[in-house]
Amino acid sequence: MNPLLPFLMAGDPSLEALPRLLSEAKALGLPALELGLPHSDPIADGPVLQAAAQRAINRGATPLRVLEGLAGITDSPDLILFTYLNPLLQIGADRLRRLLAPTPVKALLVVDLPFGEEPAFERGLRDAGFPMVPLLAPTTTLDRAQQILAERPDPGAAAPFAQRFAYVVARLGVTGTGQGTDLAPVARRVAELRALSERPLAVGFGLSDPRSLAQVRSLGATPVVGSALVQALADGQGLREALSGRMVGDG
């Protein structure tokens, strides 16, 4: 099981700092990392990630510059590109595949892409080696979840975590800390999904403190840390310090 899936916003604090952060993440032993593509209308993001995206945009971190800046980087965990559909459509499918090819990006998590809405776009990316991460909300029925998992198939145990996992949304609403997350429904949800598929599961939205992360791990799932980490970095902490207490074996 992957013990932690952190989230970073590309371009915050700067595009120039991104290679160093990715290198530090790999040195910490993180096998995968979510990398947010800054977007001006991030409907699923809470105030912390919205502010980070705006800072990145203000410093010139366009989607194109982010992807171009990732080219050739090898000292990095596997990246899951966390993004919205419109910036990708503006780049175009063919160009997007060419841009992704020399980067450490292994998969995409497109938060506002309804399942089945852009089949040709999604299929082209998957065939090029960039599958879409299945996103399973609390309102997703089990029948629907089974369909999504079948249409976004597990490539198998030989594939990296970044290309295998399904993302379980812990609660409705936007990302962020301080809102509280009742993990009892999450435990039931994880158990239900385990009966449908053997693929790895990651749980995100509203997780931040070491106790909640440990609870998610006890379910055999990977906790996602986003807003708490992004805020710590914005407050001037280094990556190792920001993740202190949240890694397995800390504390």
Question: What are the functions of these language-model segments?
Answer:
Residues 187-199, 208-251:
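Alpha/beta catalytic cores of nucleotide-metabolism and tRNA/nucleoside-modifying enzymes
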